Design a protein with these regions (language model features):
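Conserved HGGG/HGGXW glycine-rich cap/lid loop of the alpha/beta-hydrolase fold
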Residues: 11-63
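Conserved alpha/beta-hydrolase catalytic His-Asp/Glu region
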Residues: 129-131, 149-208
Length: 271
């Protein structure tokens, strides 16, 4: 994997790529809010010698800093497309965990025919119809919660709340420690992320996935209403849904072998 950069009007994005044949399928890994490229370490290890792979530190996250919080979900999707173009990628398969899944759906809205596959890991649909007015109201008001909650407790609840395995919890803790001593930045990242998510939902766009897709969700995912959303998403769209038994919100870190196998089977069926 080679670390690379892409300049935007708001700052520089760091990403890692291993691309041997740009015209083959490329797995594009998109980490969730406040996580970084390390979230997918177990997936990268498994796939980097078999497939083209790309993973980023999302704007304002980890090494993609300093970065102005003057962008929305669609800017993220456009910058992602610019990065794929920079690498000559023609057949991206978006694999997004949580907020990363929302980036994938925004990408599908902007570039309906570019995406060759979509895997949602503990994410949820972007369509307005799935969320209540109260949920949207709350999303817009999360920053002060993260800013004023004692950091020690935030670290504990943040890492223990998203994973059930020691590996998954320790990894989330490590990723959160990137912001140790700068809780304001952590709160800004989280608050801004939730606000741009709410704004994308309020746009009330179709966010239709026109390519092959797969939903993955941990049975112990207690982040927001992920389990409820995934049941409804599957019911309404008929996109296949696989439950990861005993896994939390970062199910790819709790049961990496199972998630890797699911991704492998999924891409094998994409022409």
């Amino acid at each position: 994997m080679k670390e690379k950069t892409y300049h935007t009007r708001c700052g520089m994005i760091h990403y890692w790529a291993s691309v041997s044949n740009p015209d083959a399928l490329t797995l594009v890994f998109l980490p969730g809010l406040t996580a970084d490229h390390r979230l997918f370490d177990k997936q990268i290890q498994h796939f980097e010698n078999r497939q083209n792979v790309i993973v980023w530190d999302a704007p304002a996250h980890a090494s993609s800093w300093p970065f102005r919080f003057d962008f929305d979900l669609f800017d993220k999707a456009k910058w992602l497309d610019d990065i794929l173009n920079q690498e000559g990628i023609t057949k991206p398969v978006m694999i997004g965990q949580s907020m990363g899944g929302y980036v994938g759906q925004a990408y599908a809205q902007l570039y309906p025919d570019k995406m060759k596959g979509f895997v949602s890991i503990d994410s949820a649909p972007l369509q307005r119809s799935y969320v209540t007015a109260v949920e949207i109201w709350l999303l817009k008001r999360m920053e002060p919660v993260y800013a004023h909650y004692p950091w020690k407790w935030l670290l504990k609840s943040g890492s223990e709340g998203v994973a059930t395995s020691d590996y998954g919890r320790n990894l989330m803790r490590e990723m959160m420690l990137t912001y140790d001593g700068n809780q304001k930045r952590y709160a800004q990242i989280a608050g801004h992320g939730f606000r741009i998510l709410a704004a994308a939902m309020e746009k009330d766009l179709p966010y239709e996935i026109k390519c092959p897709a797969l939903l993955i969700c941990g049975t112990q995912d207690h982040a927001g209403s992920c389990i409820r959303y995934n049941k409804a998403w599957h019911r309404n769209t008929k996109i296949p849904l696989t439950w990861i038994e005993g896994a939390g919100h970062n199910s790819n870190t709790d049961k990496p072998e199972q998630v890797n196998r699911l991704i492998e089977e999924f891409i094998a069926n994409i022409l």
